[in-house]
Amino acid sequence: MVMEMIAAADVREDDEDYQSPLDELFERLELRNPESLAVKQYKIYKQAAGKTAKSILISVGVRLAAFNLESIAGLTATDELELEQVGERKTAIFCVIPDNDSTFNFIVGMLYTQLFQMLYYSADIVHDGELPVPVHFLMDEFANVALPDEFDKLLSTMRSRQIFVSIILQNLAQIKALYKDSWESIVGNNDTLYYLGGNEQSTHKFMSEYLGKETLDTNTFGKSSGRSGSYSTNYQQAGRELLTADEVRLLDNDYALLFIRGERPIFDKKYDILKHPPYP
């Protein structure tokens, strides 16, 4: 529909009085609803000179070119997901994207943005602050999807509305590339951090620092012999990382590190999903 409207728009630089089919469409809309936001925004666009208006149309057409594809147009033509039911009843939505081509990953990003907006509206306006059915986002391929603006702020406010997120990354370098100034805030807004292992240096260093230090008690004994022999004992305390960055790198593949807010770090064996009872 949007691409049809863009196709109906036409600008003639030598004839400012020319009316395109899209101009006529907005005129009819203004007759029905003079206060329409769409009409007000379109009037702002129409203030542009012919050359500028044509440039705007070309830019919009290029940015939305993917929607000219029949498959994408068919996918987005009608609403079949019933997003308004998420948070109202038990629902599962699977968004599968290829790991070797990010061309259409923006569609999942659009879904995230729209869904977060609807969930916040439902929680705040319809249900007085909290969704009746908790919603959990499992964000695999987190670094490869366009996320809503100010996602770090959403992350700090969503839990009170019964909206939860699990962010899955290959390493910390991915989130640092996406959120150069706020990646620490995103990590800090997660109450649980589960490290399965990896081979990226800055991640090893971060995990080592996150684990903290242990205190080592050292007793040193000294003895000298001879006519004036003596005996001495020296007691010292020293700090050491629970795991150095190199030890984190060499972490056994069967083990993982678990950090839960307010608890000491946990070094435990990974769960074998194949042993889970419902596993087919």
Model-flagged regions — what are they?
Residues L155-L257:
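Conserved ATP-driven motor cores of ASCE-family P-loop NTPases powering translocation/secretion/packaging/pilus
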